[in-house]
Amino acid sequence: MEAQQVAEPRLPGGATPTEDLPTRVKTVADVAADHAIAVDSAARFPAEAFHAIKARRLLGIQVPKALGGEGVGIGEVADVCYQLGQACGSTGMIFAMHQIKVACVMRHMGENATLQRMLRRLCAEQLRVAASTTEGQGGGNIRSSEAPVEHREDGRITLERKASVISYGAYADGVVTTARRAADAAASDQVLVTLLKSDYTLTRLQGWDALGMRGTCSEGYTLKASASAEQILPEPYENIHARTMVPFAHLLWGSVWTGIAASATAQAQAFVRNAMRRGGQLPPGAPQFTRALATLRTLRGMLTDSLRRYEQCMNDPQALAGLDFQTLIAVTKVEASELAAQTVMHALRACGLSGYRNDSEYSIGRHLRDVLSAPVMINNDRILANLAMPVLMSPMAASLHD
């Protein structure tokens, strides 16, 4: 299906926003909410929302000021994801995915001048970056790559990989992709490669007719690239994965899911209030609203605690590699995805048939379909299975304060 065309805003290089971040985010969220139903029903890219995101210069907010960004921390980025998630799950998830890749480049580029220039350009032109980390039969195992980087004598590289999913790939200005370091390298010996649109072609392999998150347009492609070797991040992907990729992904995805859950809970609250006004008594589903509110509070508390823990150790490689943190960040994803789904189900039951109907002002259908993507975005069972052996020998806490 063709995406609705929305004219891209023209941005002067180096222009700075005239409004504060909360005002800009509120404006964008309003636009995203206005078009969320159309994006979902047509399974189309949320063009209007990203027109507004680009116009209000949100794509480079976490890039350091020295490179043209605003130097915003992960806590503020997570809050943007939360607010966009309330408005439109697909918009929030695309924004989160973009920011995850920006963080990987920003935190691991070292003194690489080519990558610094790319970040400057991203901020100046408000470029949108997609991710290519799933491949072939590997599916969600992003710590394994089939396709190798091929190095040429002229200092350039080539890469061809069959990506089972590149979310919003057709609408991106660049792709950040994993790859095997070389043809003779092990599948787990990976690098991260940054590509701009002029560096690659995408050949569509499969479409995206999914239950939810329909606007992410997460189609499959064959990616063929030719680029400078300087576009490879200097650090091994193993380090990037543990220190940035996984923490940012789990925390920003979790923020989007929490936003979806909050929006569903607000729908349930509005339904219960309206029923009270019209009938003079609580509707049968009112206790489910209380349960939705309780699980939402648990979810928000867990997520903000995990954000705080990451902010405290995000520049400490030893702490990030430790079992305690790796367990925390993995369990955060599992618990956030399941609590968000529980919250939305409680909200649906609070609204009853009005929540079940797609043509109701209290419909929870889109929220439910979007949030059900959460447990299968890197399958929870895979995460728990990977944790099973490492945590088996971990001591149980002897005190509430341990």
Task: Please provide the spans of the model-predicted regions.
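Generic structural signal for well-ordered, non-transmembrane alpha-helical segments
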Residues: 26, 259, 290-297, 330, ...
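C-terminal helix-coil-helix/basic helical segment that borders enzyme active sites and/or dimer interfaces
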Residues: 33, 37-40, 298-335, 348-358
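Glycine-rich flavin
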Residues: 47-55, 60-167
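Glycine-rich phosphate/pyrophosphate-binding beta-alpha loops
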Residues: 164-169, 249-252, 377-378
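A short core secondary-structure module
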Residues: 165-202
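Glycine-rich beta->alpha junctions and the first turn(s) of the following alpha-helix
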Residues: 208-300
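Alpha-helical scaffold segments that form or flank carboxylate-/histidine-based iron centers
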Residues: 247-253, 281-292, 324-335, 363-372
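Glycine-rich phosphate/cofactor-binding loops in nucleotide/flavin-utilizing enzymes
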Residues: 353-402
